[in-house]
Design a protein with these regions (language model features):
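Low-complexity repeat regions of mature extracellularly deployed or surface/particle-associated proteins
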Residues: 1-138
Length: 138
């Protein structure tokens, strides 16, 4: 497990059980939070956060699951839950180009991926504000 933090008041929790699980967190800027929980074998989780007040949660159990979250906006929420074998979840969230810092609340995006079973893939890309995405695969 690897955590690289810069900026102010960033918080990261990584809990891993099992064998050959990998978790990587890179946090910059202000008040970003990440929680990664992995159990099983050969799972990979990655969180890359910049911006302000972003929250990422990854929970994986099983074998060979991959979850990647990239957040570069404001007040974004990403939640990836995977159980089983061979799932891939990718969530990318960013503020709109030229976004004005005084409108932080407008940038709020939310993405939730839930994958059960085997070999599911989900990709969500959110740019701007007020976007909501929910993916459930079984």
């Amino acid at each position: 497990a690897s955590v690289d933090q810069g900026g102010i008041s960033n918080d990261s929790v990584i809990v891993q059980e099992g064998t050959q699980n990998v978790a990587e967190v890179l946090q910059r800027d202000l008040k970003n939070t990440s929680d990664i929980y992995q159990s099983g074998w050969d799972n990979f989780a990655s969180v890359d956060q910049s911006g302000l007040n972003n929250d990422a949660k990854i929970n994986q159990s099983g074998i060979e699951n991959v979850s990647e979250v990239t957040q570069s906006g404001f007040n974004d929420l990403a939640d990836s839950y995977q159980s089983g074998y061979g799932h891939t979840s990718t969530i990318t969230q960013s503020a709109a180009s030229g976004f004005i810092g005084g409108l932080l609340s407008v940038a709020s995006n939310s993405a939730n991926h839930t994958q059960l079973g085997m070999n599911n893939t989900a990709t969500t890309t959110q740019v701007g504000g007020g976007n909501v995405a929910t993916v459930y695969q079984h």
